[in-house]
Every structure is written in C-alpha cells, then in structure tokens.
C-alpha cells in the first residue's frame, strides 16, 4: 500500500511539473508572453543567452540570418542575467528580432537542463527537444531543416 501511495504521489508531482510548463512568462520588457513548451503551436528555437557572454554576442548576427531562413519557427530568447536591465540593454542595442524571456533564477532553464551559455534548444511541435547545443554544430542546421521540411 505504501508503494502504491508513493507511486501516486510521484506521478502527481510529475503531472504538476509538466502542467506548470504551460504558462505566461515575463519578457525583458515586462510584457507577458504565453507559450506552452509541452505543445507549442509550431517548432521553437530557444536561445539561452546572457549579456556578459561574449560567445552569445557573437552568435546574434548568425541567428538573425537563421531566423530569416526559417521564419516558420517561433524564435525566443531566454536571458539568464541576474539583472534583467542588462539583458534589456543588449536587446535594444543589438535590435534582437525575437522576444526574450527573463529567467534570472533559471526556472525555465532548469526544466531544459541548461548548463551554460550560449545554448540553443530546438523543440518540435510536440514539445520534444530535438536539438541542444551551439549554432556552430552542423546538427543545429540539420534540425532546423528537418523540422522545416515536416511543416
């Protein structure tokens, strides 16, 4: 009986954590952004970045080009700065064409098992992470092309 109770508790905790992944989030400009990471309306490219990350800044022009090549995706930044104002400043100065969610406590980042910046995560429309890594990896482009062909 204890084993069944433990199983039911663990299962309900899992369901709660999955359900809580469909939320309204706050952008760097304090706007509300709604997305269900479990079942997004279309594939998502999640760009995990920070203003102090030199590699992140180097990626921006390349990612802007990828966005032009793949407008059928939802492109979304995940800024992990402790001070969101630093992220806001970069977003404006570099004219980022995608909104960025503010995640200073890595609440979203932890759900995606983010361990550093820059990290790119590509989700299919079922919410499965089909790619996790850096843009310089050939697999990133392959993941975009594969999902694009499935659209």
Predicted regions mapped to residue ranges:
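Conserved redox-active cysteine motifs that mediate thiol-disulfide chemistry
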Residues: 48-65
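Bacterial N-terminal signal peptides that target proteins for export
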Residues: 1-8
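A short beta-strand-turn-helix
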Residues: 24-44
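Hydrophobic beta-strand anchors of alpha/beta hydrolase catalytic cores
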Residues: 45-46, 75, 120
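Thiol/disulfide oxidoreductase modules built on the thioredoxin-like
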Residues: 92-96, 104-147
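Conserved segment of the thioredoxin-like fold in thiol-based oxidoreductases
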Residues: 58, 65-105, 117
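Short pre-active-site segment immediately N-terminal to redox-active cysteine/selenocysteine motifs
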Residues: 41-44, 48-52, 116
């Amino acid at each position: 009986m204890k084993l069944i109770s433990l199983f039911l508790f663990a299962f309900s905790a899992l369901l709660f954590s999955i359900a809580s992944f469909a939320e309204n989030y706050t952008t760097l400009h304090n706007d509300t952004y709604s997305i269900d990471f479990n079942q997004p309306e279309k594939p998502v490219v999640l760009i995990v970045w920070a203003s102090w990350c030199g590699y992140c800044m180097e990626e921006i022009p390349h990612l802007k080009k990828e966005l032009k090549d793949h407008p059928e995706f939802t492109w979304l930044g995940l800024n992990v700065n402790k001070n969101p104002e630093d992220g806001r400043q970069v977003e404006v100065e570099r004219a980022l064409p995608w909104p960025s969610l503010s995640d200073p406590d890595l609440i979203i980042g932890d759900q995606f098992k983010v361990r550093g910046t820059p990290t790119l995560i590509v989700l299919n429309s079922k919410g499965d992470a089909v790619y996790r890594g850096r843009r310089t990896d050939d697999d990133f482009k392959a993941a975009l092309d594969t999902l694009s062909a499935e659209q």
